[in-house]
Amino acid sequence: MRRFDYAGLENRKWGNEVVNYLSLIHEYKGKQSTYIKQKPRELERLVEIAKVQSTEASNSIEGIRTTETRLRRLMNERTTPRNRDEREIAGYRDALNIVHENFDYIPLTPNYILQLHKILLSHTDSGFGGSFKNVQNYISATDEAGKRFTLFTPPAPYETPEAMQVICDEYNRAIGEGKVDPLLIIPVFIHDFLCIHPFLDGNGRMSRLLTTLLLYRAGYEVGKYISLEAKIAKNKDAYYAALEDSQVGWHEQQDDPTAFVKYLLSTIIAAYRDFDDRIQIVSPTSLDTVKNAIENKLGKFCLLYTSPSPRDTERSR
């Protein structure tokens, strides 16, 4: 099994682009604290919108969808799931609510990750929610001729529990030492999580839940008000490209996570920009206008992602 050393990120040269990204996000974080104090009631209403968008977008990336009406009823818990897709959606809803409401009390450990995964799949009859994979999985794609091929082979099932323990320990150690910016440690951890691919199902969705959780715990709460999942869904080709670039040489510890770090940081910046723009116009009446405009677009995710490629489905689900 490969070694992990997150504390060593302190000595890595990230380049001006990454440094500029970090500075900008730090600046936005300062504004975030001011906004939360000034307009708490209005911002709470933005939370409702972001939860719906996040649940729809994160599932849409995996080819999981339902109608706009059914989505809203599921989010409000006014109906029960009718099929596999709706059960998946209900599970993400529940897991996201847990993250939103309890992030301060959810440390990064394999046990808590397993619990979150169990919640994610709690409405399905898969039978492996809350358990690491017990058979080898592969990150695959399908070429234009319809031939399937392997892009990346994650660690074997017997290596997975130890790998998950190590990356959690490394993350917590690096965060505790305070020498490396959490905004660098988080994407590197998520990248390693996706390379390990610890579950038979739900790896992509779990990676997005963990991204949100770790950002919240680090004080970056923009995902509460602006859906990070929706940003990823909008640019999922760039997401997959960054992940593939960063996976090269991973088993041999020759990988370079910079592409994925840049991608995630740019996504956070895009969310903060939207947050900054929206907060300038937010008021009890104007927020209703914003909410209605966003809700009118929710159903369009179904149109945007009606034909996910097998490549996309295999890589994240």
Roles of regions detected by a PLM:
Residues M1-S307, R311, R317:
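FIC/Doc superfamily catalytic core
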